[in-house]
Amino acid sequence: MLRHKTFQNKIAVSRFSLPVTATLIAMIWVAVGLVQGDIWTELAFALASTLLMVELNNRNALMRTYSRMVSCSFLTLLSVTSLPEPSLHANVVTLCFIAFTLLIWNGYQDRQSTGRTFYAFACLGIASMEFVQILYYLPILWAMMMFFTNSFSLRNFASSILGVIIPYWFAAGFFVYTNNIDYLIAHFASFIDFHTLFDYSMITVHQLVNLSFITLLAVIGAVHFLHTSYADKIRTRMIYESFIMLDIVSFLFLVLQPQHEYELEGIMIVCTAPLFAHFITFTKGKLCNITFITILVMAVLLLLYNLLFSPVMLL
């Protein structure tokens, strides 16, 4: 007997899912931009990030069947949690982190992939110019190269160091030329500023609700994947397990330094979108369909909450 496809299953494999989602999201961004102000640069970064997520999905076969849920989930999560005042800094960090992920997994099991490693970590170096605290991820990412991409070697390690440094090599020349080297010193000084640990005084209720929504989807996606990972190829399992690890690390960093919520939330969205997309694509049954519809409704309500209600400080 053929199983009747639920609403969730139809959406998951539809070729119209991404075009429809992108059109609706773009209309929302344009409407918000006309009312709120100039957010067109942020919109361009959001669309570019979505295209990179499409490429990440295609290059690594994140879904073992045709599905555009990775990019749909990413674009929806990014828009719902960032509007009406998206952060340009966070969008730059998000774009660079996706580019890093795409490049580093292109060197899977290749301990001679010095070029890919260099460019991957150069993306991380560019991101650190906007958000220097992302350099705290370096030990985690080297561990990821050891245990997940299986591409760690002394040559690749040296390439990663050079990749992180190279953006600052060019920036330092500019700052010396403009006699503004103090800005670069202050930039690195903020890297070791621990006076703001556990400072939740700048966090709003909106930010807490957004983080709770992303965390909920991350937990749902992670639990589902760990339960069904046997059906995926080893490389795919490694990718998803690295996403779970980075989600956990990002959440812990966010607890430690909540003032960086926008940038860390962007990294969490990159890691959470494939996990939840896997849940949407490969779960069946009435309960899962109800869960999917409930989360869609929650996303709409969260968007309306962020757009219509002014932020209120948590403390």
Predicted regions and their residues:
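Aromatic- and kink-enriched transmembrane "portal" helix at the membrane-lumen/periplasm boundary
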Residues: 34-35, 73-91
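Perimembrane helix-loop-helix junctions
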Residues: 137-162
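Hydrophobic/aromatic-rich transmembrane helices and adjacent perimembrane loops
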Residues: 261-278
